[in-house]
Amino acid sequence: LLLDEPLSNIDQNFKEEIQTKLKKIIKDLKITTIIVTHDSYEAFYLADTCGILLDQKLKQFDTPYNVYHIPNSIEVVKFLNRGVLVPAKVTSPKSLENEELGTITGNFSKPFEIGSTVKLLLQPEDLHHDDKSNLKFDVVDKKFRGTNFIYSLKTDKNFILPVFVHSHHVHQHEINEKFGIKRPIHIEHLVCF
C-alpha cells in the first residue's frame, strides 16, 4: 500500500486520532505500507523503519529511534531540524571537549581518533536545566509545546542551543534571563561528524 501525504491536510487534533487508527489497521491486516510524509513525528509514530530521501538519494534507512538519535549524516540532521552542530575535540574514547560547554561524556555513535576535531550534534533533550549551575547562557527564545518548553540559549560564540524542559518545571525562564546547564554533561549517543 502506498500512501502519499495521507494526513497532511487534516486538523491536528483529528490527525492524531486518524494516525492511531491507521497504525492499528496496518498492523492488524499486516499490510506492507510505504507512507510518504514530510512530518517526521508522523513517520516516527507510524513506521517500523524510516527512509530519509534527499536529492533523490536514500540517505538513511533505519528504525525511527536510530534516525532521530543516531542520524548518519549532516544532511539527515538538517532535514530533521531538531538540533545544532557545535565544534568539539575528541579527548578520549568516551568524551570530548567543547570550548563553551566543557567536557561532555557518552558513547560515540562511530569511532574517532583522540584529538580529532568534530561537529557534535546537540538535540533539545541532550542538555539539562540547573538553576544552580555556573554554566549559564541567555534565553533568546521560548516555545511552549504544552507538555514542555523548548528554550533557545545563545552562547558567547553565537551558537543557539535548544534545551527541552517539562512545562511543570517550577521556575520558568523568560527571554534575556540566564539559564543554567547541568554539569557534568552526559549524552548517551555522541553523534559527531
Residue spans for each PLM region:
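Residues located in well-ordered beta-strands
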Residues: T63, E75, K89, K136-D138
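Non-catalytic connector elements of ABC transporters
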Residues: G83, K94-F193
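C-terminal boundary and immediately downstream tail of ABC-type ATPase nucleotide-binding domains
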Residues: H69-P93, L121
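ABC ATPase nucleotide-binding domains
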Residues: L1-E75
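Glycine-centered flexibility sites
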Residues: Q56, D62, N81-G83, A88, ...
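A general secondary-structure boundary signal
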Residues: P6, F14, H38-L46, L58, ...
